UniProtKB/Swiss-Prot annotation:
Location in the cell: Cytoplasm
Claim: Protease is one of the keywords in the record: no
Record text on subunit structure and interactions: Heterotrimer of UreA (gamma), UreB (beta) and UreC (alpha) subunits. Three heterotrimers associate to form the active enzyme.
Name of the gene: ureB
UniProt protein name: Urease subunit beta
HAMAP family: Urease_beta
GO MF annotation: an example: urease activity
Pathway(s) annotated for this protein in UniProt: Nitrogen metabolism; urea degradation; CO(2) and NH(3) from urea (urease route): step 1/1
PANTHER family to which the protein is assigned, alphabetical: UREASE
Organism: Rhizobium leguminosarum bv. trifolii (strain WSM2304)
Swiss-Prot/TrEMBL GO biological process terms: urea catabolic process
This enzyme's EC code(s): 3.5.1.5
UniProt record similarity statement: Belongs to the urease beta subunit family.
Lineage of the organism: Bacteria, Pseudomonadati, Pseudomonadota, Alphaproteobacteria, Hyphomicrobiales
Amino acid sequence: MIPGEIIAASGDIELNAGAPTVTLEVSNTGDRPVQVGSHYHFAETNAGLSFDRAAAHGKRLDIPAGTAVRFEPGQTRSVTLIPLSGKREVYGFRQLVMGKL
C-alpha cells in the first residue's frame, strides 16, 4: 500500500439503487440560468422553472451528491427525481415546507 492510495472494489456502484423515481419535464421560463443542486428540495426551486411541483414534493434530483443541473433560459429538459431520505424534514429553501414532508 502506498500512502494515500485508494484501492476500489471491483464492479460498478449504482447510485440510489432501488429508489422509486419520477421523471418530469422542466422549463426555464426566466431570462437567467437556474442551477439546482443534488439535494435541493426540487418542489421549492426557482419560481422561473415551470413543472408539476406537486409531483416533485418531497423529492430531489437523481444525480451524484455535490453535482447540479443547469437550466438555461428557454430550455426544457427532463429530470429524474427520487424521494428525499433520512428524517424527511425540509427547512429553509423557499420556506414552503419548514418541517416534516
